[in-house]
Amino acid sequence: MGSNDYYDLLGVSRGASEEEIKKSYRKKVFEYHPDRNPGNKEAEEKFKKISEAYDVLTDSDKRAAYDRYGHSAFANGMGGNQGFTGGFDGGFSTDFSDIFNDFFGGGFGKTSRQSSRENMRGSDLRYDIEVTLEDAFKGVKVPISYVTHVQCSHCSGSGGEGTAKSVKCGTCNGAGRIRTRKGFLTIEELCHTCSGEGEVVKNKCKRCAGSGRVRNEVGILVTVPRGIENGNKVRVNGKGEAGYRGARSGDLYVYVVVKDHKFFTRRGMDLYCNVPIKMTLAALGGEIEMPSIDGTWTKLKIPEGTQSNDKLRMRGKGMPDIQGGERRGDMYVQVTVETPVKLTKKQEELLKQFEDESNANSSPKFSGFFQKIKGIWKDISS
């Protein structure tokens, strides 16, 4: 079983803070908890030792005693008057409520049977899917299949064969919890025979061996809502792992990956795209037909004098709000003014004529730039 040193059991240094001890304990107790390792005696023993270590190291007096005397501090009911003070009462039990709340979402202040039913709940599952941007725009139903534990159809989840009835657990005498004492340290935990139920099935189901669940393939349709974003998850209640002996099933979390689009880039509810336009259209203005994510085509007005990298806004042509309603984001079109190539002689003549008749007002940025450069060189040379 390895070292019995309390610090080694929890995987922390001797100078570890209480918060570090608690954090490490959470991981260890989750890993070795008997409910997650049914029938594993080694895990059960490890769980007991880890719990004992946690109880000692999170109590300042007990920890001081352990640091000074080691395990002998707790042998044979040694009290506070033997080598140290601390006012021990000779019998105490570990309080797991703050730890198990983190794992099982319930209060250990509830009855043993209530808390045990929560601990027998099936695990949540994760499934990843890919959808297109068009799917994310309109919403889509995606068929998926996966293998998990489902309720045993032979016993309907009861874990019993036929009309078998439950009887009082002989290990805990129906209490659902057992106490283990070592020295004056008393640890209370769920009964591993009945998993805290206080009852056991007399004749176990032959198909599921009394667990009330079997592994099988599940097929469902996942509804992906309109406006879903990359990385969002969809929760499907009760479609996770089936619980033990009729306990509540876990949930299925479907994580959505929205594939990159060839034309649009998405930022929140807004869409962005790049479009080349002719030099003449940029200079004179006009209209072009633009595709929208909803599959329609819409006219976009190009203002006179449009420059490369100008962004033109098309209101309400973006993605829908995932919260519902008719609100949509916008579409931003960034234009690139294309310079003509492979000109005919007539086109060259017309462009030369255009150049001859151009003035500073026709290309203000161009003229202003070179005027500025000339001014810089003049200042340097003077």
Curated annotation (Swiss-Prot):
SUPFAM superfamilies: Chaperone J-domain (SSF46565), DnaJ/Hsp40 cysteine-rich domain (SSF57938), HSP40/DnaJ peptide-binding domain (SSF49493)
GO MF annotation terms: ATP binding; heat shock protein binding; unfolded protein binding; zinc ion binding
Entry's localization field: Cytoplasm
ZnF bounds (CR-type): 139-217
Cofactor dependency: Zn(2+)
Cross-referenced PROSITE patterns: DNAJ_1 (PS00636), DNAJ_2 (PS50076), ZF_CR (PS51188)
Details of cofactor binding: Binds 2 Zn(2+) ions per monomer.
Coiled-coil annotated residue ranges, if any: none
Binding site for Zn(2+) 1: 152, 155, 205, 208
Residues in CXXCXGXG motif repeats: 152-159, 169-176, 191-198, 205-212
Entries under InterPro entries matching the protein: DnaJ (IPR012724), DnaJ_C (IPR002939), DnaJ_domain (IPR001623), DnaJ_domain_CS (IPR018253), HSP40/DnaJ_pept-bd (IPR008971), HSP_DnaJ_Cys-rich_dom (IPR001305), HSP_DnaJ_Cys-rich_dom_sf (IPR036410), J_dom_sf (IPR036869)
GO BP field: chaperone cofactor-dependent protein refolding; DNA replication; protein refolding; response to heat
Record-stated family: Belongs to the DnaJ family.
Domain notes: The J domain is necessary and sufficient to stimulate DnaK ATPase activity. Zinc center 1 plays an important role in the autonomous, DnaK-independent chaperone activity of DnaJ. Zinc center 2 is essential for interaction with DnaK and for DnaJ activity.
Role of this protein: Participates actively in the response to hyperosmotic and heat shock by preventing the aggregation of stress-denatured proteins and by disaggregating proteins, also in an autonomous, DnaK-independent fashion. Unfolded proteins bind initially to DnaJ; upon interaction with the DnaJ-bound protein, DnaK hydrolyzes its bound ATP, resulting in the formation of a stable complex. GrpE releases ADP from DnaK; ATP binding to DnaK triggers the release of the substrate protein, thus completing the reaction cycle.
Protein name (database record): Chaperone protein DnaJ
Organism, as annotated: Anaplasma phagocytophilum (strain HZ)
Gene: dnaJ
